[in-house]
Curated annotation (Swiss-Prot):
The gene is rpoC. GO terms for cellular component: DNA-directed RNA polymerase complex. SMART domains: RPOLA_N. Gene3D superfamilies: 1.10.132.30, 1.10.150.390, 1.10.1790.20, 1.10.40.90, 2.40.40.20, 2.40.50.100, RNA polymerase II, clamp domain, RNA polymerase Rpb1, domain 3. This is DNA-directed RNA polymerase subunit beta'. Its EC number is 2.7.7.6. DNA-dependent RNA polymerase catalyzes the transcription of DNA into RNA using the four ribonucleoside triphosphates as substrates. GO terms for molecular function: DNA binding; DNA-directed RNA polymerase activity; magnesium ion binding; zinc ion binding. It is an enzyme of class 2 (transferase). Zn(2+) 2 binds at C814, C889, C896, C899. It comes from Chlamydia trachomatis serovar D (strain ATCC VR-885 / DSM 19411 / UW-3/Cx). Its cofactor is Mg(2+); Zn(2+). NCBIfam families: rpoC_TIGR (TIGR02386). Keywords: DNA-directed RNA polymerase, Magnesium, Metal-binding, Nucleotidyltransferase, Transcription, Transferase, Zinc.
Length: 1396
């Protein structure tokens, strides 16, 4: 555990010279002889008059050391010269008072006491060793019943429980000496001591081998694991019962006198006093031969007092202190946010730091921050003192401090000198990702606020409405070097989560640049409107300066003449640039003076998105230094131009569209029609609600677009400030513009449901009282959401960090041949995420060729794809690419650089020791918080998305693939299944069957793909030609229809009124509707179709789910395509990350979703087999092998497959979300990984948040680190045990080498919380959650923590094994190993010489 040497363990621990930590159970001997410096016999603490500790009490100086440095209790010895002397009068050693922080004592107990952790923490360790239930043990420990320890020659059984009456009866029958039965801790101690663990282990293994029941095997395996832990460690089971209690050093449980004769004390002192009082009383009682019943009660009270000391409230009612508050026990000291681990070890307050309000510093360079002089003086004080002493200005520290307080002129000179090249760290809470702490060169400023460069605000998520930031000074040379090289703001201009620039101009800067780069404006002839020509940029700039740089739209005739003087910045001009004549504007020429030449002449308008692209392009072409200079220039230019342009918004700039009245009237008419349909009973109330909302959503979009185009139109002649702000991306968006000038639109209730009647007024017109009241609903929801969800998001980040903290880059290349396959992500025909974005920066696992040309290699196996290569692959039309991934990485610890790919923060291959796990966790957690905070910005506006029709984007041939359709009476094709799609293909003159064959084998690519829902109406026939803009299909948004595909007569089956159906009179329409209701029993509601009215020949049956409304009558004659019933879809709720965050948590915690979908277990064809116990029996039959898999599906679930449908393994059979564990079981690890990554990404994509796949992959990798043993073979592993893959393969390798049978296991999916607790490091797990359980578990099996992860090293005060500490750790490990080898060698040679 420690480096070998002559010094004692404590000294080594102090110096941190250890590389592993072992935990175990302390024996009584250890507590009494090794830890303790004396026994505490009195409950007294300090004398209330003298405030001096009482002798032999809880603060005794003789035991714990002096309260004053170098001074004994009685005052005989004072000063350091008596160091080490033990006073002959008071017995106190003369030493430093700080020993009172480390010296412990003990209390000798009158009777053995059971340690509550080992008995009450589930699973009960004592119960498992003895094979007794926790309730039986409890009765013994708390002196309610006797337990037989030695049955002797009686008919009793060992460990049998006897109550008082039974005990007396047995004593009468056999005599008191014929057997041994005891109560309390003593009994448990004797039982544990007499337990033969070796033979128990053999017996358990034998029983495990013979048992067939899965449940019993799991139980036995758990018990076996605990027993094995004791056998393999140096722990003895009887040590779980205490005879001595250790007492914590007094300075860790202080007692502080307050004014007025009262004391503030740690709760531990009260708890210790209770134990001592009861213990002393019990000792006295035992000496006096008191009646058994009193003794027993006193022993029980002592057990309870010790329980309260270790874990108050774990057994019975907690012990209360003053003010009826439960006292904080030793367990509470460790647990939770304010426990020792999280409060003092993982997060400490640091010296050399300060905080202040921040203000904007537009004059600063990118790598600078403004530091108030007073603050700098305080922070750099020791540096100043050293410099002043070196200069000879002062000779003592005291005089230097006085000089600093005086503010002498030379102090300021020294300060200026010191801060040059000494970076400081700025941090803004909450630090959600690594960009929350960055280093800057300080610039001394007057005032008291810290100045921050405007471009770093986005990374810190800072604004200047009162935000504060903390400043930290890196002290050591190494820390300063790290801050300079790795943490400077210019090195952090890209997001580690997506690789996009984070330092981009925003707000005013964007507006200024956009205005400068605006499209050319046409000036009439009378203002000299001829297009002027210039020979070069210099001439343009000269002309601009001559005219005083006119920026207003009002054009002064006097300023313009034929010589071209006083040109306008938006005027169209011709200029020769690089030998070419370009049509541009003076503004653009001026902007290009700051653009690096390598980027070429920028001749287009510059909204924020394009600026961002330009920065990325600049970094790739000219490197970091030039990019940072360019960013500073952009900032400067942006602010100057927006100030000069003086763009401000007036009320009249908000134009109300003229067609508003017309559109609203039309909408009200449509709503009236829908209402009439409802009253006539054609549609349900749910459908009416959904249709109404669809109408208003459409109106909202129409008006929004009308308003936007009106403002845009006006901008062509004169800049509309509102349009400038929105189009440039400086402030606001279309949705907010819509509320200002069109209508506020639909509002949401706090529960997410949409209020039907929209707010038709806008802010320019003003809201009515009713509208204002409806508005307040959504606004308040936004505020409440923010408060609640921020906490949720922070907790999610914490769990993610904990699960991924030890994923570091440990090697360059693991050499794996495994890969994953990625392709473009599409939604319908829309491309959501192109292939190039998914493969950029990833390692290719096999050569990629130009399609149809094997000689042209686009990328070789092992290449890390550059953006140019990724672009080429995408342009070549390649569908999917095989890439290496952290999911398939085979590194023994952490992951390798090749499987991870590029570091997105700098575009280079990731370096060794990089903490990619923590980066991944922050990348996923940070936007969660951002988005939850962002909900209220829309003021609760219902943001729903609806697309009721599909329109062809280009000309082509329409091909149905995997679609079952029926032609209705109007000649339209109605879709009967859910799995198919419409494909638009290039017209190449082939036959329809050829197209279908080529599409199904993926031999040709479709121009567009449209997945179609059940019940969609296709308006174009299969194989027909379509033109761009033609309507192809209409989608049913409000209902899931059940459509008949054959003609015939209707017959109701199992549609029994009052049992499976009910007639409901619609309150509003008065019409009676037949609805299928949820029911219990053997009924299987369905509609059968017969060929004739006599019901002789059955044509088909249709299962009707509960909640469906039946649309046909018994005996009615129907034609194909007619609606039999319809199941209304749930009312539309707004899409919001509020729904999204819990979804991410549900995925990463691997929880089973509510109303989960059933999925097919094998490939085959669907059939039904009736009903059993209120469940529908659905069978999937493999037609080749004849194999069948039965699915019992609740009648309340809605099936999305029908009889005769072909399904593939893992395909959904019912509506709902899929259970991830089922995907793992049925489809395997690869499919599950793909599912989890895509599902998490979908939540973020919906909010427009860009996170690279590799981050999600790391989290998913950590969730799949373990396997569950199904057959232990000859290994030491246990049945049902979850072990690390690494450990499993190692154990199997060892067993196979020894000629044994290897173990079998299946992969297991763990949620992130469970995975964190299952980590190898017990220190890391204990600091996360379930502290007592983790520590108990670790102590029982004497676990060793090798300090490999980050958290455990931070807790132990070591350098972390990542980043710059990665190499250091490696070197130390090698050095220690070498030292140990030398030691062994020396020992051997010594041994030989002695033997010789």
């Amino acid at each position: 555990m420690f480096r070998e040497g002559s010094r004692d363990d404590a000294a080594l621990v102090k110096e941190g010279l250890f590389d592993k930590l072992e935990i175990g159970i302390a024996s009584d001997v250890t507590i009494r002889d090794k830890w303790s410096c004396g026994e505490i016999k009195k409950p007294e603490t300090i004398n209330y008059r003298t405030f001096k500790p009482e002798k032999g009490g809880l603060f005794c100086e003789k035991i714990f050391g002096p309260t004053k440095d170098w001074e004994c209790y009685c005052g005989k010895y004072k000063k350091i010269k008596h160091k080490g002397i033990v006073c002959d009068r008071c017995g106190v050693e003369v030493t430093l008072s700080k020993v009172r922080r480390e010296r412990m004592a003990h209390i000798e107990l009158a009777v053995p006491i059971v340690h509550i952790w080992f008995f009450k923490t589930t699973p009960s360790r004592i119960g498992n060793v003895l094979g007794m239930t926790a309730s039986d043990l409890e009765r013994v420990i708390y002196y309610e019943e006797y337990v037989v320890i030695d049955p002797g020659n009686t008919d009793l059984v060992k460990k049998q429980l006897l109550n008082d009456a039974k005990y007396r009866e047995v004593v009468e029958k056999w005599g008191k000496d014929a057997f041994v039965a005891k109560m309390g801790g003593e009994a448990v101690y004797d039982l544990l001591k007499s337990e033969d663990l070796e033979s128990l282990l053999g017996e358990l293994k034998e029983r495990l081998r013979k048992t067939k029941s899965q449940q019993a095997r799991m139980k036995l395996a758990k018990r076996l694991k605990i027993v094995e832990g004791f056998v393999s460690s140096s722990n003895r089971p009887e040590w779980m019962v205490l005879k001595n209690i250790p007492v914590v050093p007094p300075d860790l449980r202080p007692l502080v006198p307050l004014d007025g004769g009262r004391f503030a004390t740690s709760d531990l002192n009260d708890l210790y006093r209770r134990v001592i009082n009861r213990n002393n009383r019990l000792k006295a009682i035992l000496r006096l031969k008191t009646p058994e019943v009193i003794v027993r009660n006193e022993k029980r009270m002592l057990q309870e007092a010790v329980d309260a000391l270790f874990d108050n409230g774990r057994h019975g009612h907690p012990v209360m202190g003053a003010g009826n508050r439960p006292l904080k026990s030793l367990s509470e000291m460790l647990k939770g946010k304010n426990g020792r681990f999280r409060q003092n070890l993982l997060g400490k307050r640091v010296d050399y730091s300060g905080r202040s309000v921040i203000i904007v510093g537009p004059e600063l360079k990118f790598n600078q921050c403004g530091l108030p002089k007073e603050m700098a003086l305080e922070l750099f004080e020791p540096f100043i003192i050293k410099r002043l002493k070196d200069q000879g200005s002062v000779y003592t520290i005291r005089s230097a401090k006085k000089m600093i307080q005086r503010g002498a002129p030379e102090v300021w000179d020294v300060l200026e000198e010191i801060i040059k090249g000494h970076p400081v760290l700025l941090n803004r809470a909450p630090t959600l990702h690594r960009l929350g702490i960055q280093a800057f060169e300080p610039v001394l400023i007057e005032g008291k606020a810290i100045r921050v460069h405007p471009l770093v605000c986005a990374a810190f998520n800072a604004d200047f409405d009162g935000d504060q930031m903390a400043v930290h000074v890196p002290l050591s040379i190494e820390a300063q070097l790290e801050a300079k090289v790795l943490m400077m703001a210019p090195d952090n201009i890209f997001l580690p989560s997506s690789g996009k620039p984070v330092a981009t101009p925003s707000k005013d800067m964007t507006l200024g640049i956009y205005y400068l780069m605006a499209d050319p404006t046409y000036f009439p002839e009378e203002h000299g409107g001829k297009t002027k020509a210039f020979k070069d940029e210099v001439e343009v700039l000269r002309a601009l300066n001559a005219g005083g740089f006119i920026l207003k739209d009002e054009i002064c005739g006097s300023r313009r003449d034929e010589t071209g003087r006083g040109i306008h910045i938006h005027e169209k001009i011709k200029v020769r640039i690089d030998g070419q004549i370009i049509e541009t504007t003076p503004g653009r020429v001026f902007f290009n003076t700051i653009v690096p030449k390598e980027l070429g002449f920028q001749n287009y308008s510059m909204p924020s998105k394009r600026i961002s692209e330009l920065i990325l392009q600049c970094y790739k072409k000219v490197g970091l230094e030039a990019t940072v200079r360019f960013l500073d220039d952009l900032k400067e230019l942006g602010f100057v131009q927006s100030t000069k342009a003086a763009i401000s918004m007036g009320l009249k700039d908000v134009k109300i569209p003229e067609i508003k009245k017309e559109i609203l009237k039309d909408a009200y008419d449509k709503v009236a029609v829908v209402k009439k349909q409802y009253e006539d009973g054609i549609i349900t109330d749910g459908e009416r609600h959904s249709k109404t909302i669809s109408i208003w959503t459409e109106v909202s979009d129409l008006l929004s677009n009308a308003l936007y185009s009106e403002i845009k139109k006006q901008t062509n002649s004169k800049h509309n400030p509102l349009f400038l702000m929105i189009d440039s991306g400086a402030r606001g968006n279309k949705s907010q513009l819509k509320q200002l000038g069109a209508l506020r639109g639909l509002m949401a209730k706090p529960n997410g449901a949409i209020i039907e009647s929209p707010i038709t007024s806008n802010f320019r017109e003003g809201l009515t009282v009713l509208e204002y009241s409806i508005s307040s609903h959504g606004a308040r929801k936004g505020l409440a959401d923010t408060a609640l969800k921020t906490a949720d998001s922070g907790y999610l980040t914490r769990r993610l960090v904990d699960v991924a903290q030890d994923v570091i880059i440990t090697e360059r290349d693991c050499g794996t041949l495994n890969h994953i396959e990625v392709s473009t992500i599409r939604q319908g025909s829309e491309e959501l995420l192109p292939l190039k974005d998914r493969v950029y920066g990833r390692t290719v696992s096999e050569n990629i060729y130009q399609p149809g040309d094997k000689s042209n290699v686009l990328a070789y196996a092992g290449d890390v794809l550059t953006s140019a290569q990724a672009e080429a692959i995408d342009d070549a039309g390649i569908e999917s690419v095989k890439i290496r991934s952290t999911l398939t990485c085979e590194s023994r610890r952490g992951v390798c650089a090749k499987c991870y790919g590029l570091n997105l923060a700098n575009g280079r291959l990731i370096g060794l020791g990089e903490a990619v796990g923590i980066i991944a966790a922050q990348s996923i957690g940070e936007p969660g918080t951002q988005l939850t905070m962002r909900t209220f910005h829309l003021g609760g506006i219902a943001a729903t998305s609806s697309t009721p029709e599909i329109v062809a984007e280009c000309d082509g041939i329409l091909v149905y693939l995997d679609l079952r359709v029926v032609v209705d009476q109007e000649g339209n094709n109605l879709v009967l299944n859910k799995m198919g799609a419409l494909h638009l293909v290039q017209d190449e003159g082939r036959s329809l069957s050829e197209y279908k064959k080529l599409l199904s084998t993926k031999s040709i690519e479709s121009l567009a793909t449209f997945p179609v829902e059940l019940g969609a109406k296709i308006l174009v026939n299969d194989g027909a030609a379509v033109a761009a803009g033609q309507r192809i299909a209409e989608v049913e948004l409000h209902n899931i229809p059940i459509i008949c595909d054959k003609p015939g007569f209707v017959h109701y089956e199992d549609l029994v009124e009052g049992v499976s159906t009910e007639k409901v009179t619609n309150k509003n329409t008065g019409l009676v509707e037949l609805i299928v209701k949820q029911h219990r029993g053997e009924l299987h509601p369905q509609i059968a179709i017969y060929a004739d009215a006599n019901m002789k020949e059955l044509v088909g049956t249709y299962a009707i789910p509960s909640g469906a409304i039946i649309s046909v009558e018994e005996g009615q004659r129907i034609a194909p395509g007619m609606l039999l019933a319809r199941l209304p879809r749930g009312a539309i709720k707004t899409k919001d990350i509020t729904g999204g965050l819990p979804r991410v948590a549900e995925l990463v915690e691997a929880r089973k979703p509510e109303d989960a979908a059933d999925i097919a277990k094998i490939d085959g064809v669907v059939d039904f087999k009736g009903i059993q116990k209120n469940k529908r029996i659905l069978v999937v039959r493999d037609e080749i092998t004849g194999m069948e898999e039965e699915h019992l599906i609740s009648l309340t679930k809605h099936l999305i497959v029908q009889r005769g449908d072909s399904v593939i393994k893992g395909q959904q059979l019912t509506d709902g979300l899929v259970v991830p564990h089922e995907i793992l079981e049925i489809c395997g690890v690869r499919e599950l990984q793909k599912y989890l990554v895509n599902e998490v990404q979908e939540v973020y994509r919906l909010q427009g948040v860009d996170i690279n796949d590799k981050h999600v992959e790391i989290i998913v990798r950590q969730m799949l680190q373990k396997v569950r043993i199904t057959d232990p073979g000859d290994t030491t592993l246990l049945f049902g045990e979850d072990v690390d893959k690494k450990e499993f393969y190692e154990e199997n390798r060892r067993t196979e080498e020894d000629g044994g049978k290897p173990a079998q296991a299946v992969p297991v999916l763990l949620g992130i919380t469970k995975a964190s607790l299952g980590t190898e490091s017990f220190i890391s797990a204990a600091s996360f959650q379930d502290t007592t359980r983790v520590l108990t578990d670790a102590a029982c099996s004497s676990k060793t923590d090798y300090l490999l992860g980050f958290k455990e090293n931070v807790i132990m005060g070591h350098m972390i094994p990542g980043g710059t500490g990665f190499d250091t750790h490696k070197r130390i490990k090698q050095h220690l190993e070498k030292e140990q080898e030398d030691l062994v060698f020396d020992f051997d040679s010594e041994f030989e010489s002695v033997a010789g």
